[in-house]
Curated annotation (Swiss-Prot):
Keyword Cytoplasm attributed: yes
Superkingdom of the organism of origin: Bacteria
E.C. number: 5.6.1.7
UniProt-annotated binding residues for ATP: 50, 413, 494
Subcellular location: Cytoplasm
Quaternary data: Forms a cylinder of 14 subunits composed of two heptameric rings stacked back-to-back. Interacts with the co-chaperonin GroES.
Protein name listed in UniProt: Chaperonin GroEL 2
Entry-linked Gene3D superfamilies: GroEL (3.50.7.10), GroEL-like equatorial domain (1.10.560.10), TCP-1-like chaperonin intermediate domain (3.30.260.10)
Organism: Chlamydia pneumoniae
GO cellular component, one term: cytoplasm
Protein family: Belongs to the chaperonin (HSP60) family.
MF terms in GO: ATP binding; ATP-dependent protein folding chaperone; isomerase activity
Gene name of this polypeptide: groEL2
Keywords: ATP-binding, Chaperone, Cytoplasm, Isomerase, Nucleotide-binding
Length: 526
């Protein structure tokens, strides 16, 4: 292993090349007329996608410093998607524009810290302008428009999202049993406790664990060590090639967690550790509820040192499992129907007889797990590749549409950014470096509209001129129909939260890059 060092401008130039290479790979898929990108990695199935984050994740460069630029940009995109479900490509084109122009300022002798200060001052004014443009969703039609844009203008997926988005506590759980796309209400059960380590995830693009079916081991005590019984138990699961295993316990010692992670990563053991849900006072009864729902035997009620029976009989079973950082959701449990019904009646009677508001709320939360309120969305397509892509689109659209319902919408197609930048004047009392940074941000936020117009075969400057010549703040270019019109009326709109989050992450990583002064990386000797 040898260490490689680069000075400020040399290193920044290499990082810029990496960011620009990533942008060139992602932007052809941007907008309603963007192209699909084909991804083939090793023996994995072929993926055809227009999703920016899925494309970006596959870009790896040989040069260590160019690769560092790619990695930093990817982290920003992942943060945008994690927060809102959309906006990754918008963030990337703004990063590329900010970094490229900012580097020109540094080359001209301007202070990077002053450039950063100008960018930060400018972006705060852009946020204020975006807030003024925000429109609250007023009708199901508004929700449908947002959902369709978030689903890459797929009418079917957008309609499904709009249909189920109003249901409380929504999270898609996916199946491929039936043809087409359909939803079924009231099947999903959810508890508010998720995986204890991101190393358990099976789908890095959405940072969750998804299995068609799984076994469940429920322990009422903390797992402080891997006893011989538990090791033999894990070996039994592996040898018999059964379903994946979810282990739910009061807590997990770090050494135990590390061992489970290593077994998953090195030996392919499909396992996930989940901390027992509920407050400390309620944890025991919530675990009993889960045991009833899944058909598991609750182990360790009497003593923390009790042995775990080396048998599959004590395991519960669940179907259509989705585990995120915060929740554990499943569609069907293997519990006895009569026992489940008896528990539901017991909880209903307890609620009716409770005189304590807090106790009543706790009982209602427990009852909600039994009743279930998570819609099942079933997706199939002609090929597995298409099915995976549509499933990913649907999940992203769900998150983005929920974001729109919280914060409202702004005109889409990059118009909100354009109008915001056009309404802002550069303050007169700034230094040359701050002025440069201020203007750089105002130009960078125009880039998403420019890229979209170019992907639709239009001159970006002509499109911008036409838009700004109209006073209607919602007037813009509709790439779907290749016309200029009121974008909100046409259903071309973006969630405000997605718009601001993409800009926030873009500014954050760009300022980090521009103010870096020395670069160190390693590479293997050849």
């Amino acid at each position: 292993m040898v260490w490689v060092f680069k000075s400020q401008f040399e290193g920044l130039s290499a990082l810029k090349r990496g960011v620009h290479a990533l942008t060139k790979a992602v932007t052809p898929a941007f907008g309603p007329r963007g192209y699909n990108v084909v991804i083939k990695k090793g023996k994995a199935p072929i993926v055809l996608t227009k999703n920016g984050i899925r494309i970006a994740k596959e870009i790896i460069l040989q040069d260590a410093f160019e690769s560092l630029g790619v990695k930093l940009a990817k982290e920003a995109l992942l943060k945008v998607v994690e927060q809102t479900g959309d906006g990754s490509t918008t963030a990337l084109v703004v990063i590329d524009a900010l970094f490229t122009q900012g580097l020109k300022g540094i080359a001209a002798g301007l202070d990077p810290q002053e450039i950063k200060a100008g960018i930060l001052l400018s972006v705060e004014m852009v946020y204020q302008q975006l807030q003024r443009q925000a429109i609250e969703l007023q009708s199901p039609k508004d929700v449908l428009h947002v959902a369709m844009v978030a689903a890459n203008h797929d009418v079917t997926l957008g309609t499904v999202v709009a249909t189920v988005i109003s249901q409380a506590d929504l999270k898609g759980v996916f199946s491929s049993k039936d043809s087409g796309i359909s939803k079924t209400r009231g099947l999903g059960k959810r508890v508010k406790s998720g995986y204890l380590s991101p190393y358990f995830v099976t789908r890095p693009e959405t940072m969750d664990v998804v299995w068609e079916e799984a076994l469940v081991l429920i322990l009422s005590h903390s797992l402080v060590s891997l006893s011989e019984e538990l090791i033999r138990y894990l070996e039994l699961i592996s040898e018999q090639n059964t379903h994946p295993l979810v282990i739910i316990a009061e807590d997990f010692d770090q050494n135990v967690l590390r061992t489970l992670i290593l077994n998953k990563l090195r030996n392919g053991l499909p396992v996930c550790a989940v901390k027992a849900p509920g407050s400390r006072e309620l944890r025991q009864v919530v675990l009993e509820d889960l045991a009833i729902l899944t058909g598991a035997t609750l182990i360790g009620q009497e003593s923390e040192n009790c042995e775990i029976p080396v048998s599959l009989d004590v395991l519960g079973r669940v179907k259509q499992v989705m585990i995120t950082k915060e929740t554990f959701t499943f569609l069907e449990g293997g519990g006895d129907a009569e026992i489940i019904q008896a528990r539901k009646q017991e909880l209903c009677l307890a609620i009716a007889g409770s005189t304590s508001e807090s106790e009543c709320q706790e009982l209602e939360e427990r009852l909600a797990i039994f009743i279930g309120s998570i819609p099942q969305v079933q997706i199939t397509a002609d090929t597995d590749t298409e099915q995976r892509e549509r499933q990913f689109q649907l999940e992203s659209a769900l998150r983005a549409t929920k974001a729109a319902m919280k914060g409202g919408i702004v005109p889409g197609g990059g118009v909100a950014f354009l109008r915001a930048a056009h309404a802002i004047e550069v303050p007169a009392n700034l230094s040359s470096g701050m002025t440069f940074g201020f203007e750089t941000l105002l130009q960078a936020v125009r880039t998403p509209l420019k890229v979209l117009a170019q992907n639709c075969g239009r001159s970006s400057e002509e499109v911008i001129h036409t838009i700004l010549s109209h006073e209607n703040p919602r007037f813009g270019y509709n790439g779907m129909t290749d016309t200029f019109e009121d974008l909100v009326d046409a259903g071309i709109c973006d969630p405000l939260i997605v718009t601001t989050s993409s800009l926030k992450c873009a500014v954050s990583v760009s300022c980090l890059l521009l103010t870096s002064s020395f670069f160190i990386s390693s590479r293997t000797k050849t």
